[in-house]
Amino acid sequence: MSRLVVVSNRIAPPDDKKSSAGGLAVGILGALKAAGGLWFGWSGEIGNEDAPLKKVTRDNITWASFNLSEQDHDQYYNQFSNGVLWPAFHYRLDLVNFQREAWEGYLRVNSLLADKLKPLIEPDDNLWIHDYHLLPFASELRKRGVNNRIGFFLHIPFPTPEIFNALPTNTELLEQLCDYDLLGFQTENDRTAFLDCLAMQTHLSTSSDGEYTAYGKTFRTEVYPIGIEPEEIAQASAGPLPPKLAQLKAELASVKNIFSVERLDYSKGLPERFQAFETLLEKYPEHHGKIRYTQIAPTSRGDVQAYQDIRHQLETEAGRINGKYGQLGWTPLYYLNQHFDRKLLMKVFRYSDVGLVTPLRDGMNLVAKEYVAAQDPKNPGVLVLSQFAGAANELTAALLVNPYDRDDVAAALDRALKMPLAERIARHSEMLEIVRKNDINHWQEAFIKDLKQVTPRSPERELQNKVATFPKLA
């Protein structure tokens, strides 16, 4: 039976409870347990890159990790992955800081990873590579003679050609991505954007069985919306409340609660959300003294200027809004720039009347799905969701809004706060069915099934494809 080899920027080793808490780790571990295999990635430590791989084995899974030098980590991770790809793929070209040295560092680390992984690969292994840190990774493996099936899943959006083509290395990245056998995206929009970028750069041909050929390389593309563990979240949210949370719930029983949580990031639309809440208070004064909006946004990449700026902006806006609309005994907006235990947040989701999830751009946004899963089906809250989150393609029974339109968001909040129980139950039931169907295990099983059906590459087949395709002439 073929093994599965998973490669990601960071791994979740079995002895690290913090890193293994997320839903992605659950999905990857489920796939690894089913097939047996290897999880390969950065250790999270700055150190000697020539040091032997650190390996841990539990049952049929081995975790293998490596160190990065300070320079390589800075150029590969901070400067290029998060300084170029992250803002560009989230449609923020104004925040892109492209430096040729960072691009070279990004390629160097992908090459280093390929050198370290190649000796561990067995002939019939299936490889599954994750996210924007590793766009050129398959290309590096192919250079080293690896012809195994290699799949790739992009967790963030893929931008349209107008955005992507602004990157100085757009052509190189596209050609490198074509070295994957299967490219998975969160939404059809992302998949289409990738193919549109290719069609503008080179000759893109399509076969009757759904294969694409570009740059002399053949690959498949598909949509795999990532999911969550709905039953685990339902259990966590329904359990007894800790004493402090029980006291808080009692104190807030007289008001309706709007709740949001995400890491502090410019893609999440937090300043626009604060402005929309202010518009709600301005245009719908009947809610004064009767609602409370709590925004939890723990610091993310706090050493980056763009993140420092947004934190300062939110702190200023929260103070201004509370100063303008607050009353003795009523503070309309609570902004908490700190981390909370995930299981505790699921309980908070359950007693919130409105879940407000309005990113400006998001690959999926699992918080929206977690909010749905955490609700009491007999008395659920209402989800207000950005139309630019990948989750909006599935959770169509949410109140979908344009996060750039503060009046639209304010009107949706007013509607959510006034929504009758029967409508809340109907909307929640429809969304919960989708969340349960497209859970994290369905996601990984669908991807692995399709990857296994790919015909492995061979030198003869690649030569035929190169003869059949050629770049577009200028």
From Swiss-Prot:
Catalytic activity: D-glucose 6-phosphate + UDP-alpha-D-glucose = alpha,alpha-trehalose 6-phosphate + UDP + H(+)
Pathway field: Glycan biosynthesis; trehalose biosynthesis
Endpoints of the signal sequence: none
BP term (GO), one: trehalose biosynthetic process
Gene Ontology molecular-function annotations: alpha,alpha-trehalose-phosphate synthase (UDP-forming) activity
Positions marked as site (Involved in alpha anomer selectivity): W86, I156
Annotated D-glucose 6-phosphate binding sites: R10, Y77, D131, R301
CDD domains: GT20_TPS
Coiled coil ranges: none
Binding site for UDP-alpha-D-glucose: G22, G23, R263, K268, F340, L366, V367, A368, K369, E370
Keywords, alphabetical: Glycosyltransferase, Transferase
Record-listed E.C. numbers: 2.4.1.15
Gene3D superfamilies: Glycogen Phosphorylase B (3.40.50.2000)
Function description: Probably involved in the osmoprotection via the biosynthesis of trehalose. Catalyzes the transfer of glucose from UDP-alpha-D-glucose (UDP-Glc) to D-glucose 6-phosphate (Glc-6-P) to form trehalose-6-phosphate. Acts with retention of the anomeric configuration of the UDP-sugar donor.
Family in the record: Belongs to the glycosyltransferase 20 family.
Assembly: Homotetramer.
Designated name of the protein: Trehalose-6-phosphate synthase
